[in-house]
Amino acid sequence: MERFKALEQLLTELDDFLRILDQENLSSTAVVKKSGLAELLRLYTKSSSSDEEYIYMNKVTVHKQQNAESQDKAPEQQNPLTNGEPPQPSSAPQKSLPDLPPPKMIPERKQLSVPKIESPEGYYEEAEPYDTSLNEDGEAVSSSYESYDEEESSKGKSAPHQWPSPEASIELMRDARICAFLWRKKWLGQWAKQLCVIKDTRLLCYKSSKDHSPQLDVSLLGSSVVHKEKQVRKKEHKLKITPLNADVIVLGLQSRDQAEQWLRVIQEVSGLPSEGACEGSQFTPDAQRLSCPKPDITEKYLSASECGSPIDGHPEVPETKDVKKKCSAGLKLSNLMNLGRKKSTSLEPPDRSLETSSYLNVLVNSQWKSRWCSVRDSHLYFYQDRNRSKAAQQPLSLLGCEVVPDPSPDHLYSFRILHNGEELAKLEAKSSEEMGHWLGLLLSESGSKTDPEEFTYDYVDADRVSCIVSAAKTSLLLMQRKFSEPNTYIDGLPSQDRQELLYDDVEVSELTTAGEAPEEATPATDAPGEPDPDRVYLDLTPIKSFLHGDSGARAPSPTPPHQDPPAETLPLPEDSDPAPDEPLIKSPENPELQMQQESQEPEEPSLGGTEVKLQAGQQKTSPSPSCPDTVAVTPAGSSPPVKDRLKAASPEIKLGKNRTEAEVKRYTEEKERLEKKKEEIRGHLAQLRREKRELKETLLKCTDKGAAASLEQKLREVDEECRVEERRRVDLELSIVEVKDSLRKAEAGPVTLGTTVDTTHLESVSPRPKAATPTPAPDCTPVNSATALKNRPLSVMVTGKGTVLQKAKEWEKKGAS
């Protein structure tokens, strides 16, 4: 009897002790031992109960039948209220058998599954479906070990849980630092409850305790973790884990104690110091924002009203899928709405193509803090978050500063900002690409001439160095283009006192090179009644005559021979008197042609003041100030000075033909130079590739470790040089394409300005001289100017309303788009 009493007391004390352990934070080994002990206690009490029941039933006598029937009815009446649990005994047992444990432990601790008093009617089979050990796989660890909220007043409200089987649970928890069922944030803001286990230095997430392969396996070495606490309907606790080479992980916990416990374990595993209990400014790298949405103030944690189950409670595993189905649509819709709000509330200008702001880790008082850093106006600004509502520290002036990469094993992508050797700030990026991007930004804003390739990068991985250098060059180039890219329509606008067109300068420069003195030309040009200084444009109707030959002679002038009139286009005077002493052959049709041109002068107002500009053509004309309409042909033996003057006075020279030819020549030479440079780069690339191939073959055959290390270093250098040359080749190809396009436009001539030739006007003036002019001698044939202009390849540009400049700009915009 004493042994049974001692056993009864042992069971009671052991059950109380296990209940106390449920309230404590245990190590993984203690948790495993406690679970095994609880399982053994359950099996023992169940097996001993059945033996006692068997003995008890066999000892019933006829005289005690009434008592036995009353005892059989008692559990039958109380069974619906206790879900098959043992009721309180109404009377002492008939035999001196071990009593059941006190009834106070039965409703509160169902994990032990205290044996039930069964009856012959088969209540054992009916009570079996009510056992929670069959259906509560997914909630055991979370509720039994860590799920104790500050606001949880009654534990009887939450459903009891336990591990489904020792082979499923203990195997996952073996050698674990900590484990629990936690909410994990998934794609598009959905939450899923998973078994989270930290073993060694890795975080493992299982869909249920029966799974043997984790859905998520991430190394926590070097990762940062932040605890965020919100007061929405109930306190929400989230841990945001940022691994080095993986997506951000957000875990939802049910109490502050549980969150602090997990935070402490993760910090011990990662080896990073704490960033504060409720630091809320941790960030997500750009490459990870696509797969994991950033936590925002507008995002709501999965609460009881949204999912139909309390946060501090734990739904049954069969209901988990239904919960997800109920909540997934609402989460997706609310998340999409939140994404729209994020875009609308962003303070960044929408037209900015170069990103000059992002989150960086900043070393503050020997601790790394996440700050929103922004570069503008040669200053680096630090903010608490991306809303820029609160400045974290004073802005840093970047003028005259140096940027130096300073990687370390714990902070691979850190760099320093120095001024005269003194460290002003130490920053850390999240990836090699982001580090290169910021190096380029800071180099551009500081005015440093240092090339990103000149930095010393203490990395073994050549790809990482190449990524940093490439990103730095890209951001540096974009910053330079942002402030120095020319704009055709706003840069270099002509001033009021400046001449309007470039063709004026062409005329003056050509005359100066021809050796003509402007002082002597002034009396001839300033004729009475000709106050207009702009003589670049020609009126279409009183047009100059063009000759078939390559050289032409000017009509004689009453001025002395030593005075050379300037090569300007003058308005046509009404009469002209050729000098009789000039040995020129006059055409007999000159008076008729003169009358024809004089008769056309009244038609000039009908053209609306239209002026044309001669752009191209091989014919040359030389109008005289006194006799511009006299057409003559010079014999083949003309003197060289006359030819020089004719060349200088050519309208093509005055009106831009040589300018077009000069552009064609310049673009042609530029294209040839770039082609030659491209061939040199190709040859160098081929040589580098041969050298790389030979190094690889030598490295495969090499057995000496020292020589192999030097060969590997040389191979990395050659590989990096190949990448640099390949980028140069690509840039050169793009430059060649641009030069070819410019050359094609230059060869097309001024027609690309979008103007057209008014052929109807040319045809209206051409029939009259044809009818009135007989066939002259071959050596003195006058040329009808309108016919010559019509036959020339679009050399005269006629516009109806004087909108040449407007059409030119429209055409340039069309070509640019």
UniProtKB/Swiss-Prot annotation:
SUPFAM superfamilies: PH domain-like. Residues 754-763 have a biased composition (Polar residues). It is found in: Cytoplasm. One of its GO terms (molecular function) is protein tyrosine kinase activator activity. Keywords: Coiled coil, Cytoplasm, Phosphoprotein, Repeat. The modification Phosphoserine is found at residues 408, 484. Residues 512-528, 767-782 have a biased composition (Low complexity). The modification Phosphotyrosine is found at residues 56, 413. Tyrosine phosphorylated (by SRC). Residues 652-748 form a coiled coil. GO terms for biological process: inflammatory response; positive regulation of DNA-templated transcription; positive regulation of epidermal growth factor receptor signaling pathway; regulation of mitotic cell cycle. Residues 63-164, 512-657, 754-786 are annotated as: Disordered. Interacts with SRC. Interacts with LCK when tyrosine phosphorylated. This is Actin filament-associated protein 1-like 2.
